[in-house]
Amino acid sequence: MRFGKEFVSQMIPEWQEAYIDYAYLKTILQDIQASRNRSDSNNQSSTPSFARNLTRRYNRDALVSENHDIVVNTVTRLEEGLETAAYETTFLKAGEAGGDFEVTFFRTLDREFNKVNNFYRLKVETARTEALALNKQMDALIAFRHKVMDQNQKNPSVFDSVSEDINGSASEVGSSSKCTEHNVALADLMRNEDTSNESILERIRMNKTREITPLSAIKTILKVHKQDELKFTRDNLKEVEKRLQVAFIEFYQKLRHLKNYSFLNASAVSKIMKKYDKIAKRNAAKLYMEMVDKSFLSSSEEVHKLLLKVESIFIEHFSNSNRREGMSHLRPKINKERHLITFSTGFFFGCGISLIVALGLIIHARNIMGTPGQRTYMETMFPLYRFFGFVVLHMDVYAANIYFWRRYRVNYSFIFGFKQGTELGYRHVLLLSFGLGTLSLCAVLLNLDMEMDAQTKDYRLVTELIPLFLLVLVIIIVLCPFNILYRSSRFFFLSVLFRCIAAPFYAVHLPDFFLGDQLTSQVQALRSLEFYICYYGFGDFRYRRRNTCTSNIGFRTFYFIVAVIPYWLRFLQCIRRMVEDRDLSHGYNGIKYLLTIVAASLRTAYTLNRGSNWNITAWVFSGVATFYGTYWDIVLDWGLLQRGCKNSFLRDKLLVPHKTVYYAAMVLNVLLRLVWLQTVLDLKFSFLHRETMVALMACLEIIRRGIWNFFRLENEHLNNVGRYRAFKTVPLPFNYEEDGDHHNN
């Protein structure tokens, strides 16, 4: 792999603007090369051959002996009221042919390197601050452990060694710095003023971040103080250790990213200078790299020292001195693409295609669509099986989302908060999707075969139960507690789903409202689940020809309620965020879902009770809800249609290089949001059953949601890039009274 591609692939996506602009520097080198080629061609046409050879030999000898193509100076600049060191390169041969391009090259390189050096210095300063916070947290943990452990313990020095290790880390890190002021500051920060456990316990309180009950959630909303008095129990000790373990892991990841950032940028400067020397026939790389090696970016060993100490402390005190176990937490293995996954995905895909073809042939050969029971089958069995079709389609769309997020470097695993090493790739999702699709198609074919075969008519009851068996199997797999079939992802999904259902009582994070939005596109799937309950719960499956669900008052009532539930949950999430964040924009977002609730209810009412009044009312509210929702999708969720941006009617930053993709997505979003017109216009096609039409409209909504997913996360990613937000904030378990709450917010 060429360095340019490797450089981009190893970037931290949220920090991409803070890296050396390697691609732009290469374009300047191309200008230098073109200029020198023109100069050489002019010299060749005007200089005799013998004289030209002598001149070329003389210039080559001069290049070897002359090392003063550039002079690198250190200057002091005032930025935001602070004096910072910067580097300026003076090109000494600007008067030569093409010298203006070389001046531009060094000016750009200096600007890029100073940007990188200052950014790295700022992040190291932040790491120092976090090291201080973790040091104080460890002091509190030591004191807390003493209190929990047996009071008659004679040898507490085992626990005290943790604080000594961290303090020693601070001293060693400080001594490695080239800046004396930083040495003193870091040593002062990391040194405990009072090592007395009792005095520490007097100055700390526990920060409770878990919202287990509605009462704790209400206290959070009302801004009741979240600090509890210290209760020296083993449960609290386990909770503190767990949260500190997460904090150390996250801090370690930050340090690794910083180390990688330093190495990549130094390598980029080295590569670009070697290219410059080769193209311009200069000898400037050695002198410039001497400056780079002496800069803070390359000379500071603080990050390396902290990495070693964090490893030592974590292994000793969070992994029982088991290095392999400790490093498995600090450096989790990256999921590797296995050939078995690819093979299995292709196998299930082939099986699915074959089963679809077989299904079509059976329907045609046996003339199932022309049989008297076709209408009854479409009103009973089809709503049961189409649930799996909706799920499979949504999983396929999500797999496509993952593929394009990875292709355009959208850090979806960080945005969703997936644990490193457990996130699913698009191949894994497709494997599950095609597997479920194959299983569902097998059930459909088995059902049809048993229905049409005279020898199995005595087992009609078993035939009717096949969809229920399939649903129960899927539920068992999702709830399976064993570590099979991506347990971490299944449990993550279930936890997010639970928080969606309990929306008012839990803080709302991006995965919560993202899943809530997915549910709003699965209304027909939820109605299929309702039909499962009615069809099997009330015994209609025993007498298929006597389907009483559609005429049941309770079923018709819940037919309304089920369509409203996803939008109502999203509305509650918006209200919770508005109250918690004191941000009215969440309230305006809630209005969108409230309008959709009214519009969906009116359309459902019109479907069940035809009439001009219902039709007109459904038209009006559906139109308003569609306009409001489309505006919110495109302008706020996607961040498009910005005024004064360099990309007309889009935004300044675009990850997809083709603008037509964004324009097409906006048009498709509008068109697919208008699928409700089929309901109010009462469109019918002779070759399509009404249930088939409903299923097609639901599939179009799922596809629209997939398009929305990509651009929604793209916009979220670009917001993180603008704020250089590449790490999650980990709440610490203890709060020191003199520090205030801001350390843990």
Curated annotation (Swiss-Prot):
Residues 1-290 form the SPX domain. Keywords: Cell membrane, Membrane, Phosphate transport, Transmembrane, Transmembrane helix, Transport. Expressed in root epidermis and cortex, leaf hydathodes, pollen grains and stigma apex. It is a multi-pass membrane protein. Induction: Not induced by Pi deficiency. Residues 1-342, 405-427, 486-615, 682-745 are cytoplasmic. Residues 550-744 form the EXS domain. Belongs to the SYG1 (TC 2.A.94) family. PANTHER family: PHOSPHATE TRANSPORTER PHO1 HOMOLOG 4 (PTHR10783:SF99), XENOTROPIC AND POLYTROPIC RETROVIRUS RECEPTOR 1-RELATED (PTHR10783). May transport inorganic phosphate (Pi). This is Phosphate transporter PHO1 homolog 4. It comes from Arabidopsis thaliana (Mouse-ear cress).
